[in-house]
């Protein structure tokens, strides 16, 4: 029976990591929320590490409570802006990957942007309760937010938005896009 289950999972294209996440109760975003795209940035070399970190993790996984909040955010977005949709860049993250990320930023100016895996059990991503998302237009292009994903600098800080507007580092359109994303994710 175990062999048959493994064979079925492998036929469905799921890795051991993805099967493990499902076994502990995490859910696959693409399977649970139609219309939300998944582009796992750490499964590509296009991230702050410059290399593939998620070998065998191409799908986004969340705990059911986080999944429900993402579902509500998606529904709210569809009501407000039919021309936009959500893309998930990151969700549940293996602790071993968090440790690799921390090694790169530890004792640098960038360490405020990566959770220390040795404190409080690591970051929320390690438990499938955090999700990194952005908004894309109908052509699939991310709408301007004032900074790129994985940008580790002041332009990514929401607590500095007023200052960023005043200095011209972000513009009003980018601010409104950020506010829309925050609104749907927190309402």
Segment roles from a protein language model:
Residues 6-91, 103-187:
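Extracytoplasmic cell-surface/polysaccharide-interacting catalytic and binding patches
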Residues 1-4:
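Bacterial N-terminal signal peptides
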Residues 94:
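Segments that shape or occlude catalytic/ligand-binding pockets
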């Amino acid at each position: 029976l175990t062999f048959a289950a493994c064979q079925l999972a492998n036929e469905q294209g799921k890795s051991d990591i993805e099967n493990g996440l499902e076994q502990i109760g995490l859910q696959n975003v693409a399977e649970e929320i139609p219309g939300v795209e998944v582009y796992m940035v750490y499964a590509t070399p296009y991230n702050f590490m410059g290399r593939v970190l998620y070998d065998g993790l191409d799908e986004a996984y969340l705990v059911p409570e986080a999944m429900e909040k993402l579902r509500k955010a998606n529904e709210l977005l569809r009501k407000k802006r039919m021309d936009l949709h959500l893309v998930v860049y990151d969700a549940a993250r293996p602790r071993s990957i968090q440790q690799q990320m921390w090694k790169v930023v530890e004792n640098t100016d960038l360490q405020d942007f990566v959770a220390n895996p040795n404190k409080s059990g690591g970051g929320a991503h390690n438990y499938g309760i955090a999700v990194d998302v952005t908004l894309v237009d109908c052509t699939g292009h991310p709408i301007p937010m004032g900074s790129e994903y994985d940008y580790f600098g002041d332009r990514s800080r929401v607590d500095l938005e007023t200052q960023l507007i005043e200095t011209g580092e972000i513009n009003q359109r980018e601010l409104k896009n950020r506010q829309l994303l925050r609104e749907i994710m927190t309402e």
